[in-house]
Curated annotation (Swiss-Prot):
Function of the protein: DNA-binding protein involved in cell cycle control. May act as a transcription activator. Plays a role in pre-mRNA splicing as core component of precatalytic, catalytic and postcatalytic spliceosomal complexes. May also play a role in the response to DNA damage (DDR).
Keywords, comma-separated and alphabetical: Cell cycle, Coiled coil, Cytoplasm, DNA damage, DNA repair, DNA-binding, mRNA processing, mRNA splicing, Nucleus, Repeat, RNA-binding, Spliceosome
Gene Ontology cellular-component annotations: cytoplasm; Prp19 complex; spliceosomal complex
Domain HTH myb-type, first and last residues per copy: 1-58, 59-108
Coiled coil: 142-193, 511-542, 678-804
Domain of life: Eukaryota
Source organism per UniProt: Nematostella vectensis
Protein name as it appears in the record: Cell division cycle 5-related protein
Region spans: Disordered: 108-143, 246-293, 409-442, 530-556
GO biological process: DNA repair; mRNA splicing, via spliceosome; regulation of transcription by RNA polymerase II
Family in the record: Belongs to the CEF1 family.
Keyword Magnesium tagged: no
Main location: nucleus
Length: 805
């Protein structure tokens, strides 16, 4: 018995891919041909699968609240018309129906009429899905059946065959048509060669012949026009920059990781080449003094100045005194002298109002639809089905705008209006305790507000006039009940001493931390600058200093004959110089000293030098001088220099002489690489001189190499920056040379034509004379011929007359 296959069932991933490829090849109208590739699916199922799931235009994202509201409203307007509702929402009909049933189930579950576990949409074991076209595809098994493999191979072969029977037939027909055209053309050529002209008379078509004419042709105007703007530059794409990573760009994490890696490599190289510099850089980074300074707190200017505050206080004090003087004056006095300084209802609890509750429109609409679906027959009568009120005025629901209550309009320190949160009008005053008993009270007791602001509070002009008249009558009645005036005056003197004493009191405010830090940093910087000025000039200018102190420059004190006063002064200067050098070695080491301390080979020797200098400095400490003493010493030295200069008649030393002396002194100093120290050139041997010169040559070569590398980098950078300008400069230079050649050629031509013009001007009179002579000669010749002609004519006439006689 043959195997019977019922088409349908769950769609698999392989079938979906075959269906996509078939739609790409055959289009969306040949579903029978597409279904022939799928043995288990019919044409109708393939079409439904495409339009319900595989179409790229299908929206498969989560349903939004607006879409749910729109779906429920349209379902209430057009029940069961899912094909009509689907394009309005932007979903498929199956998606709309499934979502609609889900919302109804949710509404029933909300009311408690249905168990959440009892969902009819869930398939039970053994049931078949009635709509498999709207479900995701099932993944392919690892071991596929033979019929599935056969179907896959056949579909792959058919879809890969772009030269089928139809394509071959079309190619063959095209070749036959071309051969037929060539044969007809050859026949017409042979007949034309034989003298038989057979022209093809084409039948005139009604309308426009698109093969012979150009529809909507707009012929250009006659003349020459500049078309250089139409010459587009040749597009030369840089394929290296068209890669995906260049188009998308790098992520920020990748860039940060690369920069960190570069920083690590740079720091590693710096530690290998310049360890002291790296240590100093790390110490500088870890130094809290170099932390980024916080910006100063800038507050806005006060809206009320101190003078205005004083005026307000004085006005309040005056009003309080006036109220105290008429404290027992009655109700009329209280109404006239209302207290404007205190806003009513200031002691109410300050509480932020809550946002109004939001209604669940989707749930309400679902419950309305459930209620309508469960309505009994209207023949029984009774009340209508209770439903929630919906606010739909069209196809789409109206959005519920939720606004946060304005606290500024309902705070107790603002003027209260008709309701809490109402915007106060311009010129309003506080509501007093006593008001006119009417529909709307007049809060302007001292006629401060303008009339327009008062008139705006009433609905009509008549009501405003009536209210004003009532207020006027009440005011007149209150004035009539006033007591007799008393001539008691109280003068209050300003308390200037108290204010003056208060001005001298320190202001009780908390200083900003940023200002404190800034002042501390400024003070620290000032102290560092003062300390730097007290150091030696070699440290201040960062000049090279010796790594050890040579005490052999001192002379022994117990010598015969004893030292003179000048020599003793010189020894004191040397001694002070040695103390200063030791202090600089310990407290202000150079980069070479730091490098020797970090180097394992020279660490012990450098540490021993520092220890010895520290011990010597403890025995003979350096004396600290004040700034005044240092400045006075500098002044004494300057005066002594000026005195010696004037007595010795020395002039100012020119720069050339100074440079010459400096070069001579510098030539006497020689660096010994083997001993790592400087010495005089006269005291060094020939071998030491050669080593020193070799070392200097090596340093010069190294410096030259570094300069060459820097120059190459700068040249490369400038080539990148100025390459386009250089190319343009070459082009402009070539254009300039061409223009210069054209100018020279034009000048030569102009000179030639000028010479030719001069020659022509000289030859014109001669030519005119020659032409005049020719004309005169021709005129005379014509006269002679005319005379001869007249004679011959006369002779002919005479002969004819004789013949007639």
């Amino acid at each position: 018995m043959p195997r019977i296959i019922i088409k349908g069932g769950v769609w698999r991933n392989t079938e979906d891919e075959i269906l996509k490829a078939a739609v790409m090849k055959y289009g969306k109208n040949q579903w029978s041909r597409i279904a022939s590739l799928l043995h288990r699916k019919s044409a109708k199922q393939c079409k439904a699968r495409w339009y319900e799931w595989l179409d790229p235009s299908i929206k498969k994202t989560e349903w939004s609240r607006e879409e749910d509201e729109k779906l429920l409203h349209l379902a209430k307007l057009m029940p069961t018309q899912w094909r009509t509702i689907a394009p309005l929402i932007g979903r498929t009909a199956a998606q709309c129906l499934e979502r609609y049933e889900y919302l109804l189930d949710q509404a029933q579950a909300k009311e408690g009429d249905k168990d959440e576990g009892d969902d009819p949409r869930k398939l039970r074991p053994g049931e078949i899905d009635p709509n498999p076209e709207t479900k995701p595809a099932r993944p392919d098994p690892i071991d596929m059946d033979e019929d599935e493999l056969e179907m896959l191979s056949e579909a792959r072969a058919r879809l890969a065959n772009t030269q089928g029977k139809k394509a071959k037939r079309k190619a063959r027909e095209k070749q036959l048509e071309e051969a037929r055209r060539l044969a007809a053309l050859q026949k017409r050529r042979e007949l034309r060669a034989a003298g038989i002209d057979i022209r093809k008379h084409r039948k005139k078509k009604r309308g426009v012949d698109y093969n012979a004419e150009i529809p909507f042709e707009k012929k250009p105007a006659s003349g020459f026009y500049d078309t250089s703007d139409e010459n587009l530059p040749d597009y030369q794409p840089d394929f290296k920059r068209l890669r995906q990573d260049h188009l998308e760009g790098k992520m920020r994490d990748e860039i940060e990781q690369q920069e960190r890696k570069k920083d690590k490599e740079r720091m590693k190289k710096k530690k290998e080449s310049d360890l002291p510099g790296a240590v100093m850089q790390i110490n500088k980074m870890n130094n809290p003094d170099h932390v980024k300074k916080r910006s100063k707190l800038v507050l806005p200017k006060p809206q009320i100045s101190d003078g205005e505050l004083e005026e307000i206080v004085k006005m309040g004090y005056a009003s309080e005194v006036a109220r105290a003087s008429v404290e027992n004056g009655g109700q009329a006095s209280d109404a006239l002298l209302s207290e404007y300084s205190v806003t009513p209802a200031i002691n109410k609890a300050l509480r932020t109002p809550r946002t109004p509750a939001e209604q669940d429109t989707v749930l309400q609409e679902a419950q309305n639809i459930l209620a309508l679906s469960n309505v009994d027959t209207p023949l029984k009568g009774g009340l209508n089905t209770p439903m929630h009120e919906s606010d739909f005025q069209g196809v789409t629901p109206r959005q519920q705008a939720i606004q946060t209550p304005n606290m500024l309009l309902s705070t107790p320190y603002r003027t209260p209006g008709e309701g809490s949160g109402s915007t106060p009008r311009q010129g309003m005053t506080p509501r007093g305790a006593i008001g006119t008993p009417s529909q709307r009270s007049v809060r302007d007791k001292l006629n401060i507000n303008p009339e327009d602001a008062v008139m705006e509070e009433y609905e009509s002009e008549c009501a405003a006039k009536q209210q004003q008249s009532e207020a006027k009558e009440q005011l007149l009645a209150g004035l009539a009940s006033l007591p007799a005036p008393s001539n008691d005056f109280e003068i209050v003197l300003p308390e200037t001493p108290a204010e003056a004493s208060e001005e001298h009191k320190p202001m009780d405010f908390v200083e900003d931390a940023a200002d404190i830090d800034e002042r501390a940093l400024a003070l620290r910087a000032k102290q560092e600058e003062l300390e730097r000025r007290r150091r030696s000039q070699a440290v201040q200018r960062e000049l090279p200093r010796p790594s050890n102190v040579n005490t052999s420059v001192l002379r022994p004190t117990n010598v015969e004959p004893p030292l003179s006063a000048l020599q003793m002064a010189e020894e004191l200067i040397k001694k002070e110089m040695i103390v200063m050098l030791r202090n600089d070695i310990i407290n202000h080491p150079t980069s070479q000293q730091i490098e020797s301390l970090t180097n394992k080979k020279t660490r012990n020797a450098a540490q021993a030098v520092i220890t010895g200098n520290r011990a010597a400095l403890e025995r003979d400490p350096m004396e600290n001088f004040t700034d005044e003493e240092l400045s006075s010493a500098k002044n004494l030295l300057r005066q002594e220099m000026d005195f010696v200069k004037s007595k010795m008649a020395h002039s100012d030393l020119p720069l050339e002489a100074y440079s010459k002396v400096w070069e001579e002194c510098y030539a006497q100093v020689l660096f010994l690489p083997s001993q790592q120290r400087y010495t005089r050139a006269a005291m060094a041997s020939k071998k030491d001189r050669l080593e020193s010169l070799e070392k200097r040559l090596e340093l010069n070569r190294y410096q030259m190499t570094e300069d060459a590398k820097k120059a190459a980098k700068i040249e490369k950078k400038l080539k990148v920056l100025l390459g386009g300008y250089q190319t343009r400069a070459v082009g402009l230079t070539k254009q300039l040379s061409d223009l210069h050649e054209q100018l020279e050629q034009s000048q030569v031509e102009m000179t030639t034509f000028q010479a030719l013009r001069n020659q022509e001007l000289q030859a014109i009179p001669k030519r005119l004379e020659a032409l005049k002579e020719d004309v005169q000669r021709q005129t005379e010749r014509e006269k002679q011929l005319q005379a001869q002609y007249s004679e011959l004519l006369y002779e002919r006439d005479s002969l004819l007359s004789k013949l007639q006689i």
